[in-house]
């Protein structure tokens, strides 16, 4: 495949200030899109937009747990660019590993608010904007291999299972408008979300590589962004309701408690 895969497209990327979202913002604009980076990390988000170029990217501060802010972010995008073609709902949070006997339910509420409710709010308002303009749009959500297995991150795992259900439900309803809804499910990636002060990105990558199936390479945020680009573009024109794994075969080989 060659050429600009998102030429003339207008894209919102949530969680676009760092990690997978920032890589996607750079990649999508390289393929001809104009991108609105949405995040609560204002300084980081502004920096990503500036480095990409003000003619290609802009930043909008938004807390995805606040539906009014979500609606305003979509309105900002449509008023600035005249339409919305693609939503990459990528914002997410992760809690520390803990025993279920010590499950922090207040933290669980926060995780569900960001990872599920926040995605639902953006899908809702992005779809409304697409329908209003008659746009056959694409909505892509970052899920996880955790949506296929169990694990110690109980709140995160539950949220990603819920997000896949949301994707499937939205797919069934929005298809009549020509809107596609899909998920991209990465294996573990060293990003600011998964890294901690005492653990370097390289240490995380070494750990993930040891647990992974596909050897000889390490999954990077840029690899996930490439799959998001595929799902956002017309290359996947008849794909909807899918949760596409980017896991090197992990979920088909590894037991859930490995």
UniProtKB/Swiss-Prot annotation:
Keywords: Oxidoreductase
Residue sites binding NAD(+) per the record: 12-36
SUPFAM superfamilies: NAD(P)-binding Rossmann-fold domains (SSF51735)
Keyword Repressor recorded: no
Gene3D superfamilies associated with the record: NAD(P)-binding Rossmann-like Domain
Active site: 156 (proton acceptor)
GO MF entries: oxidoreductase activity
Domain of life: Eukaryota
EC number annotated for this UniProt entry: 1.1.1.-
Keyword Oxidoreductase belongs to the record: yes
Residues the entry annotates as binding substrate: 144
InterPro entries: NAD(P)-bd_dom_sf, SDR_fam
Protein family (similarity comment): Belongs to the short-chain dehydrogenases/reductases (SDR) family.
Protein's UniProt name: Short-chain dehydrogenase reductase 3c
Organism of derivation: Arabidopsis thaliana
